[in-house]
Amino acid sequence: MQNILVYQTQTYQTLVPANKRKMEYGLEHVYTRLNRIRRNRGYSFEHVLVQKLNGRVWSARRLGGSSANLPDIIAVNNKESIFLSIEAKSGTADSLYVPSDQIQRCFQIRDMFQIYKTAHVILAFKFMQKRRIREEGKTVYAHRKLQEFYKIADRYSKMKDLPVIKCTYDGSTYEIRNSQARKCFLKDYLMPFSVNSIL
């Protein structure tokens, strides 16, 4: 079997022109690099959030997010009996999205900690200072003000069919179901640190 796979690979390399193979490898390399940048951007936001939350009253930890099928962050205030299950998104576009399955897992973890008097699912959005736009088929970046929003998603706790949540640069939120977007109002959560500040 292994010999057959090696033979097929060698045949492909012989039949496909070198410049096409180079182009395919180049595109794969670009996509890999873009995905890595997006992951690093997300990890950076999560890391900064944890740093800002950790203090005399609050304790926070990153859990691993999508790869671990867990929320990005959990934070607790044991003095005031508050628990937060946080899904964090950051990017350079004008809109950021939280998939329904990621919201669901936040509720699953939140519901495990019913000993806390107050428990919220928080959708955290960070719009980077660089705004990505397309001009004449090219991607360019323009400077803009850093924006952060922390939305309470508790209203979806009892729903079986959760929507995708979209947040725009001005803080407006939308529910997306079956490719249809409908504006919704999610209350802002007052975080225990200065919002839109760079740590």
Residue ranges and their predicted role:
Residues 2-64:
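Acidic-basic catalytic patches of nuclease active cores, encompassing PD-(D/E)XK
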Residues 36-41, 123-199:
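Domain-level recognition of nuclease-like catalytic cores that cleave nucleotide substrates
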Residues 55-79:
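Active-site metal-binding core of divalent-cation-utilizing nuclease and nuclease-like domains
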Residues 96-123:
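Short, charged, amphipathic alpha-helix that recurs within catalytic cores of restriction-modification
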